[in-house]
């Protein structure tokens, strides 16, 4: 009887075990927006091959172009403010129905011509300055995902480099002109229109650079 209980307990416990599944990284294949046109192959030259007079520049959906990212940005701003204000007011009743001659009134209020005398002043000085400089250099290959009616190319590229469980991810999106592509099939990032360039990290080092959730809550709630 005891053996049956032990076997039944083991069966129940095995049902509570959660199998660890391997995390699969997302595929880097971009969805092509425009399908490649179908050409009829000839007996000598294939439609998928480069023409006799064509160069190696990207021009079709699915072609690869190398983006040389050289982004530099800097900005600075300085402001100063100074304000001041002062005011003074005085009021009195030197003559009021002859009461100023009464000794009772004058003894209680001293001088009716100086019943009220007040002054106020305020001053504010403020200054601030900010400066920022950013530099990003990288080289990444992107894929042509669409060819616009004016022959401009929409590109998208992503590169993920993992070192010691730390991922460095570079992504580039935008629109380029075929004429800006060099003979080496490269293009500088300054010629990418509507450019979306990002460089981010994922891993324990990136997590340690962020404040904890409790500190974020306190920063939002702290009124001073």
From Swiss-Prot:
A lipid is attached at residue 16 (S-diacylglycerol cysteine). A lipid is attached at residue 16 (N-palmitoyl cysteine). Pfam families: FlgH. Residues 1-15 form the signal peptide. InterPro entries: Flag_Lring (IPR000527). It is found in: Cell outer membrane; Bacterial flagellum basal body. GO terms for molecular function: cytoskeletal motor activity. GO terms for biological process: bacterial-type flagellum-dependent cell motility. GO terms for cellular component: bacterial-type flagellum basal body, distal rod, L ring; cell outer membrane. Keywords: Bacterial flagellum, Cell outer membrane, Lipoprotein, Membrane, Palmitate, Signal. It is a lipid-anchor. It comes from the Bacteria. The basal body constitutes a major portion of the flagellar organelle and consists of four rings (L,P,S, and M) mounted on a central rod. Assembles around the rod to form the L-ring and probably protects the motor/basal body from shearing forces during rotation. PANTHER family: FLAGELLAR L-RING PROTEIN. Belongs to the FlgH family. This is Flagellar L-ring protein. It comes from Trichlorobacter lovleyi (strain ATCC BAA-1151 / DSM 17278 / SZ) (Geobacter lovleyi). The gene is flgH.
